[in-house]
Amino acid sequence: MDKVILGDNQFFAVNHLSDERSRAQAVRFKEDQSILDVLDVAMDCGINTFMCTTHDRIANIIALMKKNPEKYKDFKFHPCMPYAHKYANAMTELGIVGTLKAYIPGNIMAVASKAGIAYVRKDFPTLMELLIDAEMKMFEGMNTPVIFLQNVIVDLLMGLGMDELFVHYAEYIKKKYNAEPGFITMNMPRMVDMCERLGIENPIICSSINKMGFRMSGSIEEYEEYLTSDKKFRPIAMQCLAAGALKPQEAMAYVCQFKKIESVLFGASSRAHIQQNKDLIETLSAKATR
């Protein structure tokens, strides 16, 4: 994985501390081209990996990229699924059949039959496969080396003890999409232990890691213990800036001290901030001591 990854919160008015800033972002990025312009800036700065939700507008961005395939041939997406709001809105506007037609590839009657039988039988692995295929439809023809399961699902399944679905997810992603499975969680230590117990080897785990403990379940000390341990996992640090509560230098100095952290995910929309964060991550990671 690349050391530096750009996230998408800034494009879809997600700010965990400021509603005012969220509204400003919504206005700025109301046009798809404005998002692509920022991705172009990131590429100019040397960032070629974009970790994003499966928001409908991502499909529009991909459509724009496909008009210039040579330019984006080395660009990588890390899809994060599911995007729950998308399905809730579609059910309201299109109904059940309309939602299936819109998001699930293949013959609608065959898919509906498969989904119906799976639901009646409580065949959750089959339902999961259908939803994965629906979410991945927009990424056809693009580079997707890692495909993530969102924390809203990961942490729910962990809480319910539905461990077998993690194994099925990992196997399906590898087999169907020739990609590595990734897991986003607000409880990194528990996720590491669960993957170890289930035999999911050297998992990619994306979790909030910052010096304030922002959106980190468990103590900072426990996270640090795992990040300096011999446990086999590949952590991606997100929420490093604690939604803007920390300055970049201070935030990245903390995160980048850990040698085990393979990638750092951040959101920014100006050339200056993108370049600043990239330079900090690369420079400070080279000096990692723990």
Predicted stretch roles:
Residues 1-26, 89-120:
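N-terminal small/glycine-rich loop or linker at the start of catalytic domains
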Residues 1-3, 62-71, 130-142, 192-197:
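Short amphipathic alpha-helices and their capping/turn segments at secondary-structure boundaries
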Residues 1-72, 254:
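N-terminal binding-site loop/beta-alpha segment at the start of enzyme catalytic domains
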Residues 16-33, 111-131, 159, 241-246:
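Active-site mouth loops of central-metabolism enzymes
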Residues 27-38, 55-64, 125-135, 161-171, ...:
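Well-ordered, non-membrane alpha-helical segments in soluble/globular domains
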Residues 75-88:
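A short, structured active-site edge motif that brings together acidic residues
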Residues 98-154:
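Active-site gating/metal-coordination segments in enzymes
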Residues 136, 140-145, 152-290:
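Beta/alpha (TIM)-barrel catalytic core signal, keyed to glycine-rich beta->alpha loops juxtaposed to Asp/Glu
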